[in-house]
Every structure is written in C-alpha cells, then in structure tokens.
C-alpha cells in the first residue's frame, strides 16, 4: 500500500513539473519574442465550411466597415474574425440587421471576436447582415456570397 501511494505522489509531482515546463515554453524566448499568443481549440474550428474566404477586417468607430465573404453551402459556417486596435477582442456584438437566408453567431475565439454565418440549408446566392460591435460605435456590414456544395 505504501509503494502505491508513493508512485501516485511521484506521478503528481511529475505532472506539475511538466505543466510548468509547457507553460514556460509558450512564454517569451531568449530573444525577447513572445511565444504563441492566441489559443484556438479544435471546438473553435469544428463544423466550418470547406470553402470559406474572408477578408482582414479592422472596424472603426467612424463608419460601417464592409466585408465580403465567399463560401460553399455544405452545412458549415464561415467565420469572420474582427478585433479592436491592439488585437483586443470586442466585448459583445449586436445583430442590427438580420440575414434573410441564414443565421449569425457572434463569439470570442482566442484574442478575436468572430462573426460566424451559416446559410440556410440549400441556399445559394447573396445574403447580407450588419453587426454592431461593443464597446464603441464600430459596425461591420457583411455580404455573403454562397455557392452550392462542391461535389
């Protein structure tokens, strides 16, 4: 019984040491450059459309930012990443104009806010919607061009 407890205790210490080493590996290196900053998990990319083309978007408070996305309708979503200046995610997003042929989900993924559009089943064509981002007065007008699934 004593030998078993000793083995479990050593395993626990080994796990703590390895966790610390892993966290240190993700930090700054000896040249001062930062390690990986944005964490994206498998759940963040699962279910995405096979074809999804999105532009780089940096919304400002002055006027609505235009974003055109192109995707196939294979049952998946197409995600448009947006962030405030200094790579800071927005706190929230409000759907001010709804899409006519799909759904929108606004959520945070790593250091960005992501606007996910999923077209209705069988839809092919053009759809659009507007998202207001908080804090501030930034908004994004998204035009989605959806093609049928690739065979």
Give the label of every model feature segment.
Residues 2-14:
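Bacterial N-terminal signal peptides that target proteins for export
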Residues 22-25:
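C-terminal motif of bacterial Sec signal peptides marking the signal peptidase cleavage site
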Residues 73-110:
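Surface-exposed or secretory-pathway low-complexity segments enriched in glycine-proline
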Residues 46-87:
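Post-signal-peptide N-terminal segment of Sec-exported extracytoplasmic proteins
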Residues 124-136:
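A short beta-strand micro-motif common to beta-rich folds, especially ectodomain repeats
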